[in-house]
């Protein structure tokens, strides 16, 4: 069956933090009198991700509502404050770091994204976004000029469903007007972007921009333009 639609994850698939989380945290802390080397902040990012995955494994449903999305970032930035000795104005630094990433000016677009989206559109493929993200994703994609490529954008917090729940992918299929066998999903996470769409009967590609290790049975690409080989 021919692919009529392609849906995309966002983080580490289409976008990356720019400036980085560490750079943004350092800049936020500087506003309150802290002079923290970027290298020091960067050395604690792995601990922040470890905290994220601990929370995700415990109950990833924080992605289903605004307060949960906000909380998962707040606790990571609070950990950065703790590790970097930010005591006074800790809440202000956490909030400033969080707010910086609510708009597009703090996100970069991978070099292979726009060309790939245009090529898919030229082939008549309908495009969509399915992402575990708060509703600010709508503003971010609009700020970056990417919204125009997508027929539908579904942040998890907007609909109360999160990947890898097949119900979220089924909702996207309904809104895009295609059957599962006509839709390909592309993202970077094995469970959210591999197992989830496959459980919904869709096709899946995992994009690996960081030379990771993936579960057997998943199809992995290393450049977004390779999506064109599967359409």
Task: Name the predicted role of every residue range.
Residues 2-111, 123:
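N-terminal helical cap/lid subdomain that shapes the substrate entry/recognition surface
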Residues 1-6, 16, 35, 39, ...:
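Asp-based, Mg2+/Mn2+-dependent phosphohydrolase catalytic module
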């Amino acid at each position: 069956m021919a692919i009529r639609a392609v849906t995309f994850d966002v983080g580490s698939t289409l976008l990356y933090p720019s400036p980085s989380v560490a750079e943004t945290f350092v800049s936020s802390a500087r506003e309150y009198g802290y002079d923290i080397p970027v290298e020091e902040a960067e050395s604690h990012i792995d601990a922040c991700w470890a905290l994220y995955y601990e929370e995700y494994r415990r109950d990833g449903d924080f992605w289903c509502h605004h307060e949960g999305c906000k909380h998962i970032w707040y606790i990571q930035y609070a950990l950065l404050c703790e590790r970097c000795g930010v005591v006074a104005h800790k809440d202000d630094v956490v909030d400033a770091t969080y707010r910086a990433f609510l708009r597009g000016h703090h996100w970069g677009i991978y070099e292979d994204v726009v060309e790939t989206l245009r090529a898919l559109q030229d082939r008549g493929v309908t495009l969509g976004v399915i992402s575990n993200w708060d509703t600010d994703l709508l503003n971010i994609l609009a700020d970056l000029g990417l919204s125009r490529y997508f027929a539908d954008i579904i942040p998890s917090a907007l609909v109360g469903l999160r990947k890898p729940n097949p119900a979220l992918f089924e909702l996207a299929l309904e809104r895009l007007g295609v059957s599962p066998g006509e839709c390909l999903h592309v993202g970077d996470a094995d469970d959210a972007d591999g197992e989830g769409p496959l459980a919904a009967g869709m096709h899946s590609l995992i994009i690996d921009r960081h030379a990771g290790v993936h579960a057997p049975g998943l199809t992995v690409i290393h450049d977004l333009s390779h999506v064109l080989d599967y359409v």
